[in-house]
UniProtKB/Swiss-Prot annotation:
Entry protein name: Cytochrome c oxidase subunit 2
Domain of life: Eukaryota
Family affiliation: Belongs to the cytochrome c oxidase subunit 2 family.
Keyword annotations: Copper, Electron transport, Magnesium, Membrane, Metal-binding, Mitochondrion, Mitochondrion inner membrane, Respiratory chain, Signal, Translocase, Transmembrane, Transmembrane helix, Transport
Topological domains annotated Mitochondrial intermembrane: 16-41, 104-251
An MF annotation (GO) of this entry: copper ion binding
Cofactor comment: Binds a dinuclear copper A center per subunit.
UniProt-annotated binding residues for Cu cation A2: C221, E223, C225, H229
Subunit comment: Component of the cytochrome c oxidase (complex IV, CIV), a multisubunit enzyme composed of a catalytic core of 3 subunits and several supernumerary subunits. The complex exists as a monomer or a dimer and forms supercomplexes (SCs) in the inner mitochondrial membrane with ubiquinol-cytochrome c oxidoreductase (cytochrome b-c1 complex, complex III, CIII).
PTM comment, free text: The signal sequence of COX2 is processed by IMP1.
Binding-site positions, Mg(2+): E223
Amino acid sequence: MLNLLYNQIFNVILNDVPTPYNTYFQDSATPNQEGILELHDNIMFYLLVILGLVSWLLFTITRTYSKNPIAYKYIKHGQTIEIIWTIFPAVILLIIAFPSFILLYLCDEVISPAMTIKAIGLQWYWKYEYSDFINDSGETVEFESYVIPEDLLEDGQLRLLDTDTSVVVPVDTHIRFVVTAADVIHDFAIPSLGIKVDAAPGRLNQVSALIQREGVFYGQCSELCGTAHSAMPIKIEAVSLPAFLEWLNEQ
């Protein structure tokens, strides 16, 4: 009991999976997702300020009008207030827009990737290729990843999220994901990593990730792609570099 209490107080339990009634983001594991969280929190501050100001104005005007309906009957222009309600929203939009564009372009940058993983969406599973590595047969390391049926789930496994094979990657390594599809449009999305990129047939899209901690991160296809769209989970295991090399030798 004391050990459980100690762990709850002093150990940080990170949320890397969807949880019931959760109204916020999953915990970030990459700089991109940290930037998204910071941008969201900053924008929410300005939205709350605007909400408070508009609510106060609405309440004040309604109360004043109810007391004296003809108080401003002969006022046709209010140059000062017109200048304020034109400039103030423009300034707010600029304050929001600049960080948004900076983050948008930073997320699109692929900085000297140490390894490339190709993710191919198919109805209704994912196929992965480690293009930089060749096995003993002289072929690139590749495998398919299917959702584990509900009746085969073991204790601790997640419904519609766990897969029979995982994408294993090393931490603190610049990784490039090249995403495409072989049939219809899919979407490769992992919330904790700040990744969401379309997988379109005949088109290669790329996104980078620098995973900063070990863990298991889940995602799903985020583009309606057919009857089994919900059965296209993504499971990424971030491990230490020695553990990754050991896994690679087994392939």
